[in-house]
Curated annotation (Swiss-Prot):
HAMAP family: Transcrip_reg_TACO1. GO terms for molecular function: DNA binding. It holds the Pfam family Transcrip_reg. It is found in: Cytoplasm. One of its GO terms (biological process) is regulation of DNA-templated transcription. Keywords: Cytoplasm, DNA-binding, Transcription, Transcription regulation. Belongs to the TACO1 family. This is Probable transcriptional regulatory protein MSMEG_2940/MSMEI_2866. One of its GO terms (cellular component) is cytosol. The keyword Transcription applies. It comes from Mycolicibacterium smegmatis (strain ATCC 700084 / mc(2)155). NCBIfam families: PRK00110.1, PRK12378.1, YebC/PmpR family DNA-binding transcriptional regulator.
Amino acid sequence: MSGHSKWATTKHKKAVIDAKRGKMFAKLIKNIEVAARVGGGDPGGNPTLYDAIQKAKKSSVPNDNIERARKRGAGEEAGGADWQNITYEGYGPNGVAVLVECLTDNRNRAAGEVRVAMTRNGGNMADPGSVAYLFSRKGVVTLEKNGLTEDDVLLAVLEAGAEEVNDLGDSFEIISEPSDLVAVRTALQEAGIDYDSADASFQPSVTVPVDLEGARKVLKLVDALEDSDDVQDVYTNMDIPDDVAAQLDEE
């Protein structure tokens, strides 16, 4: 029986991982479709589309899926949805601020799913503007270190508008104004430095430190929100201390 139980558990875990992978693929595909619709279907002349395609490739999205999404967005192939960007605001456990970015073809469904995830996981919705002011929209480029120093990266991107370079351990994070994002990633390319992703992102201006139990609750809420097909990104102003992060890694 124990062998069967272990097999069943393994099978369940694989199903969960496969489901998460499928949802991630769908979100990356949506980004490609929208980028092509907004800026045109040529990645060479549309940096947002180029980055969306590269991100999908690095996440092992099949090339056929990528190309079909590009064509749908560019109007070269039928079937493109009318995607709308909507941002919802709320508070999670411990008073942590939460921003939820949705890309949906059904506003009512998206709002309902976000509300349910919030209320079932210790959160609540907030009025527009009551949470957003705690965050700033920034350009964020991430890259593996691969032997590079912080000075190497700074030298490449400083004149392109980079505001800061953060050392994340195995990787670097470059922060800029969203309007300088293309210039920063272009500067990296010209310096022969490969990067993992280049996205506009919300960065918290004020953070809320949490203990282990608080971190668990907020992460559970984030998981529930990200489980919605309409949700593209979830941002919080939670600050997880190093000792708490180490405990979470062990779980």
